[in-house]
Amino acid sequence: MKWRALVCCGIAVLVGGCAQIGYFVQAAHGQFSLLSEARPIDEWISSPGTEGKLKSRLTRVKEIRAFAARELGLPDNDSYTTYADLKRPYVMWNVVATPELSLKPLQWCFPVAGCVNYRGYYSKGEAQAYAAELRAEKYDVEVSGVPAYSTLGWFKDPVLSTFIQYPDGELARLVFHELAHQVVYVPGDSKFNESFAVAVEEAGVERWMELHGDEKTRKAYGAYKERKRDFLALLLKQRKALTANYERDVSDDDKRKEKAAIFQALKDEYLVLKENWGGYSGYDRWFAEPLSNAHLSAIATYHDFVPGFRAMLAKQKDLGKFYAAVRSLSTLNKDERHRQLAGLGESTSVTAGNTLGNDMR
């Protein structure tokens, strides 16, 4: 899930109250530190001190960036024309929280981004400290690393060391996804925004592979999509089971027992998936913390409306017309646009995409 930069931090501090000042200060410091560390990609490529492998990856990003503007109609601006070596595994860490017996996530509201289902920190320690506060209040909590995010065109989003080594298909997917947020973004509607970006990334990578993917690249990305599809299906299955459990007319203790059984089933079935994948362990990080509702709450944000957006794109048969139709849809009230997307996607099956919202490669 991509945390939207708090680009109006000064205003936010004034309106957020004393309890929020520390949070907004770290957000402002983190964003501007990121920008100060970025240098133009061409400088990195021409520098004798840049390793050959990094030069190759940065050259690939330039090709992907040009393709995004030329073939996909995505914004042709300064985003992803600079590079920053952060010397850490993630650009930030998101905190997601839900009640103990519910999948409905807490929301935090910010300028520009509106209300979102997560709270981002540039420091893992600060994210974990806030997560501990929420756990003390009996919330289910997840802390997940984020490799990239979008400032919605307010700043020059840099290419980062946190994702530059991704294989070509996954690198293109991420760039297309983040640029899509600059095309259409509705403050306070994460499910709409993320599902739209997933639909764009899927269409974009398909076109990229047709024109630029060799057999090895296509095979690698195909395997990636199959694993992601399998894992998503498992998560959706257990999310459905949890929803049914929390709706039962039984005691909270009974719900807690069934909740534990569902999460154990999730772990057991994941081990079977790993065996079927030949031991691939890329999703092991998802189980690094004790499983909770928070882990599964984000699945709806990144999946539920993707089928509807796919149906819209199939009908328009042109990305420009698709973007225009999505912009028109975005002007409706939230309930109505959700209703229309749900109706469009009713008959569409699940396929893989950036549906997990974090670094689930």
Locate each region found by the language model.
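Bacterial N-terminal signal peptides that target proteins for export
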Residues: 1-7
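Bacterial N-terminal signal peptides
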Residues: 7-16
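Bacterial Sec signal peptide processing site at the extreme N-terminus
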Residues: 16-39
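Soluble non-cytosolic domains of exported or imported proteins
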Residues: 32-35, 44, 48-62, 121-125, ...
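Acidic/histidine-rich, surface-exposed loop or edge segments in extracytoplasmic proteins
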Residues: 35-52, 106-116, 289-290, 307
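Sec-exported extracytoplasmic/periplasmic mature domains
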Residues: 46-50, 59, 63-73, 180-184, ...
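Acidic/His-rich structured neighborhood in mature extracellular/periplasmic domains
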Residues: 64-228
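Pan-zinc metallopeptidase signature
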Residues: 235-361
